[in-house]
Amino acid sequence: MAVTALYVHVPFCAQKCRYCDFDSRSFASCDLDAALDSYFEQLYARLDAFGKAGALDQIRTVYVGGGTPSLAGERLVELARRIRAWCAPVEFTCEANPESMTAELAAALAKVGVTRVSLGVQTLDNAELTAIGRIHDADRALSAIATVKNAGLDVSCDLMCGLPGQTAASWKRTLDGVLTAAPHHVSVYPLTLEEGTPLYRMACRDESLEPDEDFQAACMDVARELLGAAGYHPYEVASYALDGHECAHNIAYWTGRGYLGLGRSAAGMLDAEDFDRLAGLFPGVSPRGDAYRVRLVQRDDDATAFEVEHLSQREAAAEDLMLACRMTRGVASDLLVRAARVIPADELAAACDRALELGLATWVPETLGVHEGPFTSADVVAGHVRARLAPTHLGWLDGNVLFELFWDLA
């Protein structure tokens, strides 16, 4: 498992959204600069430690998320420059919110090698934006898309369905408006109410604020139809892209590649060999024992505390199968054959059969022009037939059931 992806977390926001349970902090403007300066100095030091240890040598994708990284302004530009000094990623994404994405920042990011900006648009209905605590309006969101494109950067838009007050008509207007702005990539997420968030507490008092799952499914269907008609193909459960503009960083997550996390709440995943090689970067973390993979989450600003999860080879195989189900291509036959080395073949074939019975997945031959004839899941798992297990439309809408079938094999 080569370490090919780097995630950097910037946990600062001008105002925390009502639905958000991510690690992010909002400050009065008088305190924000000092907090950002302190945090970024710690990021720089940690980055240098990674670089000197050779941890960044094979990095191909970088993703700076948050929080609101664009709130950091010139500090974000300097961070990107320093990352580029240690590695040469082919894709470099920074998240941004419309209110803090200026033409000057977009141009500066492009100059230091950022290739892509992911904008938190969410909706183009101003009443819906207010309901979820966003501080930009629809015009500012559309302006930000144009600003990023004018700087020569790819732009992705995040959208949400099931928002308070959202209707089928307002959802279609949002999709139409985004398509007119023509980003390169669109992600569509159903709103979930996380316990402890302001919106969760509001919904406890007013049930009308709770997302309607049937409405969300209808919204996802409309999005798939309109985005598909406009040339965006669904390559992952929540994401659509124009050809050649898929998010390589997210694909690295879903295809079992190693990744590093930098910053508070950032997660990394290392195989046994890479963990042993880089263990000195994680003070206080005990040896892995016989773990096949190690997942680490930084729990403080200065990288002295980590949450650690050890995965056995069987757990890692089950996770790879589950994550592959997020991709439109589904689970490749090679992955199934490898998984059968550590998961009993009859259990693995039974999980595939159950996905077929529930209408969540279908077999798709991997060799064009070759008609395999009748075959069973056991044939694929044994390597006698080359076919991938691809999610159906129902599997796409009801992905959690499909994911659980394979994670339960751990």
Per-segment meaning from a language model:
Residues 2-5, 24-53, 58-342:
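C-terminal scaffold of the Radical SAM
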Residues 6-10:
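Short active-site neighborhood of thiol/selenol oxidoreductases, capturing the structured segment around
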Residues 356-382:
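A short, conserved structural fragment
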Residues 393-410:
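Short, amphipathic alpha-helical interaction segments positioned at domain boundaries
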